[in-house]
Amino acid sequence: MSKRFSLSILVLTIGLAGCGSVIDDPQQAVKERRKMAVVLSDVGLGDQSFSDAAMSGMSLLREKEDWFIDYRELSETKSYEAAFATLAKQQPTVVVGLGFMGQADLEKVAKQYPKQQFALIDAVSELPNVLSVTFKEDEGSYLAGAAAAIQSDSETIGFIGGMKSPLIEKFEKGYRAGATAINPDIRVLVDYAEDFAAPDKGRELANAQMKKEADVLYAAAGLTGSGVLEAAEEKGNKAIGVDSDQTAIAPDAVMTSMLKQVDLAITKIGDSVKASGLQSGQIVLGVKDGAIQLAPIRNANFTAKELHRLEQLKQEILEGKVKVQ
């Protein structure tokens, strides 16, 4: 089922799952507006992470830039390829794919529609009709690791990734580098769930790490990460969320979240395709662009000196003094 937004809808709540309403005068509006069609990540809406953040960006485009928005979830189409093909047939201004897991299918469909503009978030394509947008997740994870090291009493912290891949390893490497910048002797436990939609697996891995004395956990694992945050809360430990502010998942445990402004990526794509014709290339977003940052520190007794140290590290990133590889 196609999901479209009415101009009258100005509030988009996290966790939206039902079908949206059709715009007031669809025949007229479709002709006059640019249209963005998005295939959400495999977990879809309600992940309190990647897809929800993208939806926020789509809402901003619709509200401020007068774009017409359409999207698909895999629960409807059963495959990325079917979703991309369905949307490409509609000839929107741009078809957007979220996440590296859909890259192969996006590129397959993009080759079939060489005059259609596509965009890919979180991976890089070499095709002439695919615009790529990536993030410097290692920068934000560096700050997350520093915060974890400051908070940790056991000098052992944990990282749980959704799937071992070059993208998620950027989170891990940044986290480790930030932690050792604060405490060179800190121990960083690492596990991969190999699933972005398995909260129970996240909980299992979190409990195993906490048995090894990890008292701060960082999850870059989509919906799997919610199990990590909840497990940390149950044991009275701290956790760091990802992509969006995930405090609501475990209010007593989440001390901050590494914010990855996927909504900004969506609006950047809109601005780029609006400004010029068919294009490729790569847009890279980091701390300097306001696309990567930490949510406010909470549930942690940081001293003024420790908070200042975090700000210093952020400034060093802005000045190019810290480069996480």
Q: Model segments located where?
A:
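C-terminal motif of bacterial Sec signal peptides marking the signal peptidase cleavage site
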Residues: 15-18
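Bacterial signal peptide processing site
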Residues: 20-23
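An alpha-beta-alpha
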Residues: 58, 143-185, 190, 282-302
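Periplasmic-binding protein-like
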Residues: 92-99, 119-121, 213-222, 242
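Flexible loop/hinge segments that line or gate small-molecule binding clefts
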Residues: 111-135, 243-255
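Hydrophobic alpha-helical segments within soluble ligand-binding/sensing domains
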Residues: 134-154, 258-276
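Hinge/cleft segment of the Venus flytrap/periplasmic-binding protein
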Residues: 274-325
